[in-house]
């Protein structure tokens, strides 16, 4: 087996058993292991054992990337890392506390925005006629489908001729009122009903449509892992990544979704909600 290294800013290809010698000669203090193949990882680990016992830091590339970027490196992700890494904890206390806060905030949101809801409903009817609410099947936790509610921001039968397509940042199907609703995230308020029903949480990966889940699953590794937590009205990917409407964007967003799934906590939710509130109040973003 060969092992790439970069002493003194250059590049070298060495055998695994040469790693300790190279580390000592070049005074290397940390080795980052970026190897997905389980057999090769075992051989590299055996060679690094001597280095580790001498005080050399050995770091998995996925962990290194995560700390630098705030997302999980999909290209380097491997099953062993998922099994042995810290995080992805689902303590009963955290789940119960998160659910209790979801119920409280959803009820408060609907109560406090009730005058706004009536105005929005009237504006939609006057602008484009048709139904006020938009209903669509999405994929929830553990792959369970549910009906998501939003204020309708597009014209009726927007996909009648095209079939399922991703919504774009400057989507021509969006109505005049819909543009305002999207800018201030007002179209998302009815999802508080989804939160009350238990289909969603306030914070989590955005739920995707079954059509796109089926399309992305074979194209993006570990895609189904995003379904290990409840989907959310807002999420880590939504505040860290711009509006996306492609497979490449879905790939990038999944890295943020997995980061959230790993670090899900009340503190993490609070940070995301506060940043989302800033976006809503100042109309930044989508």
Regions inferred by a protein language model and the residue ranges of each:
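N-terminal hydrophobic signal-anchor/signal peptide
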Residues: 1-114
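Short, solvent-exposed positions on alpha-helices
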Residues: 42, 59, 187-190, 268
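Residue-level signature of the cytosolic catalytic core of signaling kinases
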Residues: 15, 89, 93, 169-170, ...
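C-terminal terminal-structure detector
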Residues: 211, 220-286
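A short, structured surface patch at a secondary-structure boundary
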Residues: 167-230, 272-280
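Phosphate/oxyanion-binding loops and surfaces in catalytic or ligand/nucleic-acid-binding neighborhoods
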Residues: 50-54, 107, 126-129, 154-157, ...
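A hydrophobic, helix-centered structural microdomain
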Residues: 93-158, 194, 266-286
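Short, glycine-rich, amphipathic interfacial segments at transmembrane boundaries or analogous
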Residues: 3-8, 65-66, 71-75, 134-176, ...
């Amino acid at each position: 087996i060969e092992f790439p290294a970069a002493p003194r800013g250059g590049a070298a290809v060495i055998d695994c058993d040469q790693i300790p010698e190279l580390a000592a000669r070049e005074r290397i203090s940390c080795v980052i292991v970026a190897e997905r193949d389980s057999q090769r990882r075992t051989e590299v680990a055996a060679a690094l054992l001597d280095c580790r016992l001498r005080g050399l830091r050995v770091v998995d590339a996925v962990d290194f990337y995560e700390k630098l970027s705030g997302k999980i490196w999909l290209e380097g992700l491997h099953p062993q890392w998922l099994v042995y890494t810290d995080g992805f904890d689902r303590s009963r206390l955290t789940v119960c506390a998160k659910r209790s806060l979801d119920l409280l905030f959803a009820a408060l949101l609907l109560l406090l925005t009730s005058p706004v809801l009536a105005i929005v409903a009237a504006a939609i009817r006057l602008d484009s006629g048709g139904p006020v609410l938009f209903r669509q099947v999405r994929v929830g936790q553990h792959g369970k489908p549910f009906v998501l509610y939003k204020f309708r921001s597009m014209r009726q039968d927007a996909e009648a001729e095209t079939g399922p397509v991703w919504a774009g940042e400057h989507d021509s199907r969006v109505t005049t009122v819909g543009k305002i609703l999207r800018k201030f995230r007002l179209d998302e308020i009815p999802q508080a009903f989804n939160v009350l029903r238990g289909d969603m949480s306030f914070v989590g990966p955005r739920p995707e449509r079954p059509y796109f889940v089926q399309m992305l699953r074979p194209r993006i590794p570990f895609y189904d892992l995003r379904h290990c937590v409840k989907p959310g009205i807002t999420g880590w990917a939504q505040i860290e990544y711009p509006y996306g409407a492609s497979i490449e964007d879905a790939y990038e967003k999944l890295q943020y979704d997995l980061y959230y799934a790993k670090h899900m906590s009340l503190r993490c939710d609070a940070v995301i909600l506060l940043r989302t509130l800033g976006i809503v109040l100042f109309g930044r973003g989508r």
